């Protein structure tokens, strides 16, 4: 077996070892038996929220076990085919099996990363909020570029994207926009994107000068029914208004848009679908997501530090820099992960940055756990 293929096999084995460690493979079968026994309980659905959580936890374990077994079996089959092909000097069989191993390596690495998304709300859908910061028209244009980037990233993963609210810029781009990203682990991936994003480029608005623009990104989990968030009606103010857009036959011309302000925290959420009733539901769901995240921030120092970086979109709160002039470079200031493929990133190729941030957080948690055991 060629040295390159031996390295690929070793990489897959490493990913499998980490997958087994994350799911605690030694006790997985026992835990699945426990889940199955509880599912058979005739009183299970007396508590619907607990039942739904149990079913999700069970399915998550089943999926993890099936993935591990599938990758392990495919690895074994491919290695055996290569060895057989080499014995029989069948180059075509060897090449096909090697190609399978290369694809399997990518799959194993991806599943290894997904296994790290083990937060309570990591599997949930996400609200993604983008706001233009310092820089006027330049910043509004930059905010629209970020919106396009995230939409393309989400679509490349098979997630669905719904625009909940958008406020157009005075001359170009957007002042703000809120999306709901629907898909498994949507929040788990997007939570690392919260913070200020900085762009350096030559102005496209006729100035010909190098400009620096900022936009703030915030990601919040869509809260499932099993997580209860109480909102005191006395604490909120609900306003209706006419939605503003770029115009055209589909623009919302009724006073159906809804803005909800949570007085104690100052949180403001909006929705501008055609139905006012639907807008109230969407905006209230977004408010509960924000309040839930706020509570997590209070209890979790790491998350708190991350979300404090979402403050004013300016120099002091950057998480990532996108430079288009005088050179091409996108660099994450937390992990130092970087690439010269600026176009690829702006077209939605964000997985490398998200993976680097996730790996950094897991490594930090592991160090903290180790220190706690000392």
UniProtKB/Swiss-Prot annotation:
InterPro entries: PCRF, Pep_chain_release_fac_I, Pep_chain_release_fac_I_sf, PrfB. Pfam families: PCRF, RF-1. It is found in: Cytoplasm. Its main location: cytoplasm. Methylated by PrmC. Methylation increases the termination efficiency of RF2. GO terms for cellular component: cytoplasm. One of its GO terms (molecular function) is translation release factor activity, codon specific. The keyword Iron-sulfur does not apply. The modification N5-methylglutamine is found at residue 249. It comes from the Bacteria. Keywords: Cytoplasm, Methylation, Protein biosynthesis. Signal peptide: none annotated. Peptide chain release factor 2 directs the termination of translation in response to the peptide chain termination codons UGA and UAA. HAMAP family: Rel_fac_2 (MF_00094). Belongs to the prokaryotic/mitochondrial release factor family. This is Peptide chain release factor 2.
């Amino acid at each position: 077996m060629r040295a390159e293929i031996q390295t690929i096999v070793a990489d897959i084995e490493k990913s499998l070892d980490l997958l087994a460690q994350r799911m605690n493979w030694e006790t997985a079968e026992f835990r699945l038996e426990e889940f199955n026994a509880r599912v058979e309980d005739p009183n299970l659905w007396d508590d619907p929220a607990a039942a739904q959580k149990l079913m999700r936890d069970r399915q998550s374990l089943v999926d993890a076990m099936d993935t591990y077994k599938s990758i392990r079996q495919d690895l074994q089959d491919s290695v055996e085919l290569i060895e057989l092909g080499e014995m029989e000097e069948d180059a075509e069989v060897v090449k096909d099996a090697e190609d399978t191993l290369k694809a399997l390596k990518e799959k194993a690495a991806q599943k290894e990363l997904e296994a790290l998304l083990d937060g309570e709300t990591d599997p949930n859908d996400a609200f993604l909020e983008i706001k233009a910061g310092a820089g006027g028209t330049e910043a509004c244009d930059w905010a629209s570029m970020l919106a396009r980037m995230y939409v393309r990233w989400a679509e490349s993963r098979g997630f669905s994207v719904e625009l909940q609210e958008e406020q157009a810029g005075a001359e170009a781009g957007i002042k703000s926009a809120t999306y709901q990203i629907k898909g498994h682990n949507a929040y788990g991936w997007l939570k690392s994107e919260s913070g200020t994003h900085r762009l350096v480029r030559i102005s496209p608005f006729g100035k010909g000068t190098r400009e620096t623009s900022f936009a703030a990104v915030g990601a919040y989990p869509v809260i499932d029914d099993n997580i209860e968030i109480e909102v005191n009606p006395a604490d909120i103010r609900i306003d209706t208004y006419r939605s503003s857009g770029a115009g055209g036959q589909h623009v919302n011309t009724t006073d159906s848009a809804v803005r909800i302000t949570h007085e104690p925290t100052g949180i403001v959420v909006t929705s501008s679908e055609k139905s006012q009733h639907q807008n109230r539901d969407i905006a209230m769901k977004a408010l509960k997501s924000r309040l839930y995240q706020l509570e997590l921030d209070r209890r979790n120092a790491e998350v708190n530090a991350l979300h404090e970086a979402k403050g004013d979109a300016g120099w002091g709160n950057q998480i990532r820099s996108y430079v288009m002039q005088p050179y091409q470079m996108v660099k994450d200031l937390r992990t130092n992960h970087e690439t010269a493929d600026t176009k690829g990133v702006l077209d939605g190729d964000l997985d490398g940055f998200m993976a680097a941030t996730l790996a950094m957080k897991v490594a930090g948690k592991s160090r903290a756990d180790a220190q706690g055991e000392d």
